[in-house]
Regions:
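Conserved G/P- and acidic residue-centered "switch" motifs that form tight phosphate/ATP-binding loops
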Residues: 96
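Short, electropositive, low-hydrophobicity segments enriched in small/polar residues
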Residues: 99-100, 167
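Active-site signature of alpha/beta-hydrolase-fold catalytic machinery across serine-
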Residues: 101-108
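Phosphate-handling active-site elements
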Residues: 110-116
Length: 357
């Protein structure tokens, strides 16, 4: 049985240190969490095996028809697809750019008021109070705390819709750090070993591990639906491929029953927009996601938000302590007290092959 998603905590404490003493591949694997934090990496292109046996679920497959589509059309099509489910839609709204775009797209597609429930808390209102006022007569509001309590023990009477994948569709994770650490010109450089290793070593990977992870990502990029030419493209692929499954499964893992849940940006048309969108001119954090903010501005007329809004972490919306440590491919969940990550170790993996090359 393979892992769908797992906590990374055992890799970071004494257990990871002890297990990796005689395993160079695990030592290299552990280092990547200095750049991707707690994300459980799964190659949805099915090109590369890492040291712990994981499976890419069909839900996240890259095997869909590739076409060029504009973001407006993609958002409209995704909204109509969700509305056609005839389910109540509980939108997790943090007040941030991605979740605000999700709400705007649904409203522009004329979602009935009795179908849309905006899940928010005081942090959501602090981040985007004007939008809260703007939509107050078109949606139903429900508190984050109430929804999370229900999901701990039961399912909602509808679908949970998050804006996870919004960052990954845009290549935000690595590129925002690259911009701040190495400057805007770096994002236009070729995705060569020298350039990517420079970023990795700035993030405290040793030189050998940095070179190995460059090869891990570039080997999987052979299956990318988009050329990986620049460091920005590299950032896009790291999220769009490697963190895609984790983005939704980290939410599902939290609850006793797997909720009826999806993300707005997982729609195939939006993924196609992501594949084809051109690198924007990025000079500071305000320059990220102009296409998202343009759609929001069209609905709200909030010029300050359009020009100056930057991403903030939105984890207070629905993340916290979690009693589950992993989800297996049969969808069973394992409690933290019962979980042994190292029992999923597989010696036949790309990093070992790289070491022995």
């Amino acid at each position: 049985m393979k892992l769908v998603v797992s906590t990374t905590l055992p890799l970071k404490d004494y257990r990871g240190i002890e297990f990796s003493k005689d395993k160079k591949d695990v030592q290299i694997f552990r280092q990547v969490h200095g750049i991707i934090s707690d994300s459980w990496l799964v190659d949805r292109s099915n090109k590369v095996n890492l040291p712990f046996a994981s499976v890419a679920l069909p839900e996240y497959s890259l095997n869909f028809p590739i076409k060029n589509i504009d973001l407006d059309t993609a958002c409209f099509n995704r909204s109509k697809e969700l509305i056609a489910s005839n389910k109540k839609i509980y939108v997790l709204w943090s007040g941030g750019i991605d979740s605000t775009l999700t709400v705007v797209a649904l409203l522009e597609a004329d979602i009935p008021k009795d179908q849309i429930y905006v899940v928010c808390n005081t942090d959501s209102l602090k981040e985007n109070y004007n939008f809260f006022l703007k939509i107050s007569d078109r949606v139903n509001f429900v508190s984050t705390e109430r929804v999370m309590q229900i999901l701990k023990y039961d399912n909602l009477d509808g679908m949970v819709l998050s804006a996870e994948h919004g960052d990954l569709s845009y290549g935000y994770d690595f590129s925002s750090e690259m911009l701040q650490i190495l400057g805007p010109d770096y994002l236009k450089l070729p995705a060569t070993r020298e350039n990517i290793v420079k970023y990795f070593t700035h993030k405290k990977l040793d030189v050998e591990s940095a070179n190995c992870w460059y090869d891990v990502f570039m080997e999987s990029a052979k299956n990318s639906p988009r050329p990986i030419d620049t460091t920005y493209d590299f950032s896009w692929w790291a999220g769009f491929n490697w963190r895609w499954q984790y983005a939704l499964e980290k939410f599902r893992m939290r609850f006793y029953r797997i909720p009826d849940s999806t993300t707005f940006f997982i729609g195939q048309d939006i993924q196609n927009w992501s594949i084809h969108h051109q690198q924007p001119d990025l000079n500071n954090l305000r320059d990220f996601k102009p296409e998202y903010k343009k759609i929001i501005f069209r609905y709200t007329g909030d010029e300050d938000y359009y020009k100056n809004k930057i991403k903030h972490e939105s984890t207070t919306l629905y993340y916290g302590s979690n009693s589950y440590a992993a989800v297996l491919e049969n969808q069973s969940r394992i409690h933290t007290k019962d979980f042994d990550l190292f029992s999923y170790y597989q010696e036949d993996n790309f990093i070992n092959q790289w070491i022995c090359r």
